[in-house]
A protein has these predicted regions:
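Local cysteine-cluster metal-coordination motifs and their immediate loop/turn environment
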Residues: 38-48, 103-106
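N-terminal first-folded block
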Residues: 6-34
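Generic secondary-structure microfeatures
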Residues: 22, 37-39, 74
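Immediate flanking context of iron-sulfur cluster ligation sites
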Residues: 27-38, 95-101
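Acidic and generally charged, gly/proline-rich low-complexity regions
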Residues: 53, 58-106
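A cross-taxa feature marking solvent-exposed loop/turn segments within ectodomains of secreted
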Residues: 26-28, 42-44, 76-78, 89
Length: 106
């Protein structure tokens, strides 16, 4: 469906932090970064990150030299998003940035 078009981008800061987590948490090498959505009730859908094996319904992308799995049903909700990593005195974590919209913390 999307061919070589990547639905999301991952900042260098976020990619570095993802690699650190994979190393320190001993994530198996056959796992990739799963990006998706969960929920959808009154609060709406929440964006999520995790590590997982590839599933039959996944599309596979190489983004910032990371293997990324996105369920085909979630791809349209993620188009144009950027994953960044924030670290300051008040907060530390991954953010989903959607140009033109408010920042969503995941």
């Amino acid at each position: 469906m999307f061919g070589h078009i990547q639905p999301v981008t991952i900042s260098a800061r976020a990619a570095t932090e993802i690699r650190k987590i994979m190393e320190t948490k001993n994530i198996p090498s056959e796992y990739g970064l799963r990006i998706g959505i969960k929920g959808g009730g009154c609060g709406g859908a929440a964006l999520m990150l995790g590590f997982d094996k590839k599933k039959e319904t996944d599309q596979e992308f190489i983004i910032s030299d990371l293997t990324v799995y996105i369920d085909k049903k979630h791809t349209l909700y993620l188009i144009g998003k950027e994953i960044d990593f924030l670290e300051n005195d008040n907060a530390r974590g991954f953010m989903f940035i959607d140009p033109g919209k408010e920042v969503e913390i995941g």
